[in-house]
Amino acid sequence: MKPRAARAALLVIGFAAARALGAQTAVTTLTITGGSTATFANPTQADYVAGYIDGPTITFTVSTANGGSQPRTTTVEICAGTATLGSGKAISKLLWQPTDNSLPYQSIVTGCTGAVDPARTVGTQTIARGSSWSGGVRLRMMLDWADSAPSYGTTIQMAVSVSP
């Protein structure tokens, strides 16, 4: 092969590789950065008098990569993995609030499937490729004097939706 033909072949391969890199699929990642295995403390008499106990804070980061220069709107949602907390305690007794106080405490709902639901939306941000945003969720358990089970529990799920 002549040197000129070899250079032309390498140049074509270089353009093909550059084009493939430019057409990469957008990747959005939701990373739980804290509180993923936290539990509530045992309630005290003062907690029962107050009617609730504050629980752990879950923190997260949403990041984007690849997929061109178009900004992406990302929405983070929180939900419970079970319909009850066990021992007869309703899931509605578990409350959540974004750490930025953009919403009041509200009851957690079951399941993160389907369309984005305002009842489980922690936050929404439009971010450019290669950018990220962080947030958090505070948990609170409503108490009453009739609560006598030694423990309650559910799996907390978080999901990220991306558009366009």
Where are these regions (language model features)?
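Extended, solvent-exposed segments with strong compositional bias
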Residues: 114-116
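N-terminal signal peptide c-region/cleavage motif recognized by signal peptidases
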Residues: 17-18
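Bacterial N-terminal signal peptides that target proteins for export
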Residues: 1-10
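Leucine-biased recognition of intrinsically disordered, low-complexity hydrophobic segments
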Residues: 10-11, 21
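N-terminal small/polar-rich segments of proteins
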Residues: 21-101, 118-164
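Secreted/extracellular small peptides and ectodomain modules produced from precursors
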Residues: 77, 109-110
